[in-house]
Amino acid sequence: MINTSIPLVDLHRHLDGNVRVNTIWELGHQHGIALPADSLETLAPFVQIQGKETSLVAFLKKLDWMVAVLADLDAVKRVAYENVADAALSGLDYAELRFSPYYMAMNHKLPIEGVVEAVIDGVKAGLKDYQVKINLIGIMSRSFGQAACTQELEGLLAHKQHLVAMDLAGDELGFPGELFNEHFKRVRDAGLAITAHAGEAAGSQSMWQAIQELGATRIGHGVNAIHDPKLMEYLAKHRIGIESCPTSNLHTSTVSSYAEHPFRTFMDAGVLISLNTDDPGVSAIDIKHEYRIAKSELRLSDAELAQVQRNGVEMAFLSESERKALYAAKA
């Protein structure tokens, strides 16, 4: 199912959406934060999807618990370190971990730039202990408005040498991409690549805007592109990568079932598409789960799954020499 001669990557993976249940428990107790349960076992349903839950509101509440326990910068560093460990232990060769410093900072009023530094330090520490390649993507959380995104951008750009790209995430309908054109001009001027969450809650116009105005070369989710034949043609022709997260799309009710997921439609149209976990801590999944689902529910053949693996490497924010090194390590 997973081809061991091809690098296994996860490109759409939120660091702040992957906090271990026991870490939430320990940090909550360490910092005197009231948790919604009185044991580790009973905490799990409050912070992870159980069974067939498919509610965006419930999903976001679980996600909020993951940052609610980030009471100091040591907690942030620990979570970053554990993200590297989890990526390595799940069999990944390469992962791009994205994070929103504003979202991580806001509960306990941590300094935004301090959060960025703690994430970088935690990742560096993890890379000393685990064999996996990691790059970081900064997120601007549009839901908090333009001014908050400016703060976030400045904290991230102060450490741009540790980032490969910037992302725009959050409330796509309430805060459309055009509100952030100036922010992304600064990102382009800084020489960083751009990905954006688009076509998830909003229609294809959101994706056009992200590509043509923000400068995105990859799109997170993008499920609504399938309703716009011209966009599908454009995506295929220009090799705009779709970071697809099927289980997350089900959990957030972006799609009502795996059978309705448009992954196959993208593949048949020749669009560059990869499999990713999104918020693996909330969804209680790893990358191998997504490949199992792609085979059993999305009906992809082993040859198609191998192509999806290759797509991920092609889409990755890596230099050609780094890509070759990933392949060489699998030989």
Curated annotation (Swiss-Prot):
Keyword Transmembrane helix among record annotations: no
Active-site residues, Swiss-Prot/TrEMBL: 200
Site (Important for catalytic activity): 221
Reactions catalysed, as given in the entry: adenosine + H2O + H(+) = inosine + NH4(+); 2'-deoxyadenosine + H2O + H(+) = 2'-deoxyinosine + NH4(+)
Cofactor binding, per record: Binds 1 zinc ion per subunit.
Cofactor(s) required for function per UniProt: Zn(2+)
Keywords recorded for this protein, A-Z: Hydrolase, Metal-binding, Nucleotide metabolism, Zinc
Molecular functions per Gene Ontology: 2'-deoxyadenosine deaminase activity; adenosine deaminase activity; zinc ion binding
One cellular component (GO) term of this entry: cytosol
Residues annotated for substrate binding in this entry: 14, 16, 170, 279
Main enzyme class: hydrolase
Family: Belongs to the metallo-dependent hydrolases superfamily. Adenosine and AMP deaminases family. Adenosine deaminase subfamily.
HAMAP family for this protein: A_deaminase
Name of this protein: Adenosine deaminase
Gene source species: Shewanella sp. (strain MR-4)
Taxonomic placement: Bacteria, Pseudomonadati, Pseudomonadota, Gammaproteobacteria, Alteromonadales
